[in-house]
Amino acid sequence: DTYGILSGMVDIDEHGLPLMEWHLEPMDPWQRNTKRLADIGISALALLCLSPLLLVVAFVVIRDGGPAFFRQERLGKHARTFKILKFRSMHMGAESAGPQLSSEEDPRITGIGRFLRKYRLDELPQFWNVLTGDMSLVGPRPERAYFADQILEKAPQYRHIYKVQPGIT
């Protein structure tokens, strides 16, 4: 987890022996295509089936003040940036002082935002990122460049994460 690595609370090696390993064997073209087709089909179906819930959540977030959606630059495959889409769960201008990791009791999180985060409803718009090809259903979570740079300083192996498409799970 990002916070654990940055805070030094998670060991990435023990006396020079890695505690985390990445096994990145490239997928065959048919495997990549099958995975992409599954991503498209499942994310399209999820967006369609969840559209009533998405509309209700968007309405509630707008009524709380501000836009329903929050876009943030993240690093994807080959460390290319893309805009991740989420329901807004923080007050407007929450990162005006610069990037910060959030915590459960973070005062920047709105009341409705706490509820959305508790049930992971703020993540549902990411099915759009999957549909457009920025993300996959399964893959490592995409990180912001600011924090990825800090992780790379402590765990150079982290660079291997950019060999695969980031995912919702």
What is each of the regions a protein language model found here?
Residues 1, 164-169:
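Short, intrinsically disordered, charge-balanced linker/junction segments flanking boundaries
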Residues 1-38:
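Flexible, Lys/Arg-rich cytosolic regulatory linkers and terminal tails that connect or flank
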Residues 11-12, 70-75, 162-163:
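Short acidic-hydrophobic surface loop/beta-edge motif
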Residues 23, 88-91, 141:
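Residues at the C-termini of beta-strands that transition into short coil/loop
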Residues 28-94, 129:
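A hydrophobic, helix-centered structural microdomain
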Residues 92-103:
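A short, polar/charged loop-to-alpha-helix boundary motif
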Residues 102-165:
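A short, structured surface patch at a secondary-structure boundary
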